[in-house]
Amino acid sequence: MSFSNREQGHAKERLLPTAKDIDALVRAEHHDPFSILGPHGDGAGGQFIRAYLPGALSVSVVDKNSGEELGPLEATETPGLFVGHFEGSRPYLLRTRWAGGEQVAEDPYSFGQLLGEMDLYLFAEGNHRDLSSCLGAQLKTVDGVDGVRFAVWAPNARRVSVVGDFNVWDGRRHPMRLRHPSGVWELFIPRLQAGELYKYEILGAHGILPLKADPMALATSLPPDTASKVASPLQIDWQDQDWMSGRRERQQHNAPLSIYELHAGSWQCELDDLGEVARQYTWPELAERLIPYVKELGFTHIELMPIMEHPFGGSWGYQLLSQFAPSARYGTPEQFGEFVNACHQAGIGVILDWVPAHFPTDTHGLAQFDGTALYEYGNPLEGFHQDWDTLIYNLGRTEVHGYMLASALHWLKHFHIDGLRVDAVASMLYRDYSRKAGEWVPNRHGGRENLEAIDFLRHLNDVVALEAPGALVIAEESTAWPGVSQSTQQGGLGFAYKWNMGWMHDSLHYIQQDPVYRAHHHNELSFGLVYAWSERFILPISHDEVVHGKHSLIDKMPGDRWQKFANLRAYLSFMWTHPGKKLLFMGCEFGQWREWNHDQQLDWYLLQYSEHKGVQKLVSDLNRLYREEPALHEQDDAPQGFQWLIGDDAINSVYAWLRWSKDGTPVLVVANFTPVPRQSYRVGVPFAGRWKELLNSDADTYAGSNYGNGGGAFTEEVASHGQALSLELNLPPLAVLILKPEV
């Protein structure tokens, strides 16, 4: 193969692109760079080679197999455009000389189409289950060459380029190929490696857009930087086979589920000499500290507030832009995977908060991604969320539907996540959510329901059940939408659980009343049992209840210091014995006084005080009882698992009920929500003999007054509360007793 710098009979106009093509190339407006760059046959067995490398001093062609230099490409009148004609057609390298050195690599424009037709078809259909291995930046070997395959969806763009340090962020250097009709742009850049930072430069209908981060990025730079990062394939030595194989049974509805909700960046932090936060812990550091703590307290699961990358820390992760990348704040994707691995080996499940409802308007993100409303609705009456100043995903678009579905599966399958708590479901279900008349667009039937979001949620739950057996999908849903946790086959949304926001609001409103007024609010604490079996519920005391002036959980409690702690212990005991799975936000388990602040760690120093240590001990004992006593968890979603004994003693603010296991073993719960000890208070029970006191929230081990029944009581043949037998109990002030018949 020899270089022909006089074209040897080939017309010079065939060597050069047309003036129109050159102009579009220089202006970075060419929609099809592969049509003019790279190798092109001359019809006689030879090839034209063209390269556009603005800033290059010279370019020559090297035989890839022999290393022989075949000759230079001619510099043209257009700076940066180099052309040449070669006889024969063999693989080649480009040797490019820059002001700062020399580079030898394959020509990105010498490679054929990259993505398979089936991948593109499934993506367009919204049904690609492993999109995180298809789009985005993927380390690949193409035609024996290692490098990175970039692929991004931008169907309305006129041109898309990959930019990064590797091309000095010059959008003219690596324009991409459009794959019709999917709207996906692709390019393979040889010899690029993991760790490279990159973005996309997109030319929209009205000009160049702000540089965009990759919607499919698997890793990111550390905020406030906003670049995406080329990630290596996950290399995690999974040692959680026992956990994963037993997960379906462990997460059945009749199993205990006690969730510790936390914010990874503010649970514990490294402090400086002044006690201020010096830095947030990484996943390995958190694993070392958090896992033993959660294990000791007896929670079955942790729930992490969103750990996907988000630009603004003050959003707590709920305004995220990287649906596939763990935040760089806490380490690498591999470190997060190892954190999950360690949790599973310790017998702790991991649930992630996941946000498919909305996304922030940051210009480097999804907003107007290709110059049009691509991921969001175009009409602000549909696409703008007034409460949060965010944009709403257009889940009616198949590609967006599939994008969010793939995100869910990415966490569940690649990171072995045990469940997703879907944020803000109510805002997804209703088109008029938080909107006044005239501020929303009805659905195609004229109604207020968001039919696209409903279809998405049902599809999500069906797909998760198929692709990640045993994984939980939990709805934070605050309205009375029917059938949230009913199967899709029965017309429901198909969630495993729904947060019981009604119970949370009513019970907190009750417990904040001065005990002297609680008689007038007696039904607030019992009303939850009217609808307790309409859904499968989780009882949530979440981060939302301890911020924005709502006070911490203990600071909501009325009375002096002693009464506040007694009320808190009674409330937690009530919660743990009430039908429904449990969720408690970090800090509540030891009675942190101040509201949660995402910029500070929890007030761990409080544990030097007996009252705080007592609350922590109580939570540990409640979790142990909850796990050990089938009556407290087996029939959470069945009316036969609960029986009122006393629900109408408003004057004394006393409640009593039985929880039943499937084999007919009861647990008795008696609650006194006044500071007045009740001596010889009679409670009807179904079985004769001694009833053992399993827990007294007023015990001295919890820093209570230790008023009680000496560890148990014997029944008397005195009928009471519809039972032939009864117990005469001493009810401690602001406390809950849990008893069980001795066998």
From Swiss-Prot:
SUPFAM superfamilies: (Trans)glycosidases, E set domains, Glycosyl hydrolase domain. GO terms for molecular function: 1,4-alpha-glucan branching enzyme activity; cation binding; hydrolase activity, hydrolyzing O-glycosyl compounds. Pfam families: Alpha-amylase, Alpha-amylase_C, CBM_48, GlgB_N. One of its GO terms (cellular component) is cytosol. Gene3D superfamilies: Glycosidases, Golgi alpha-mannosidase II, Immunoglobulins. Its EC number is 2.4.1.18. One of its GO terms (biological process) is glycogen biosynthetic process. It catalyses: Transfers a segment of a (1->4)-alpha-D-glucan chain to a primary hydroxy group in a similar glucan chain. The active site is at residues 423, 476. Keywords: Carbohydrate metabolism, Glycogen biosynthesis, Glycogen metabolism, Glycosyltransferase, Transferase. Pathway: Glycan biosynthesis; glycogen biosynthesis. NCBIfam families: branching_enzym, PRK05402.1, PRK12313.1. Belongs to the glycosyl hydrolase 13 family. GlgB subfamily. This is 1,4-alpha-glucan branching enzyme GlgB. It comes from Pseudomonas fluorescens (strain Pf0-1).
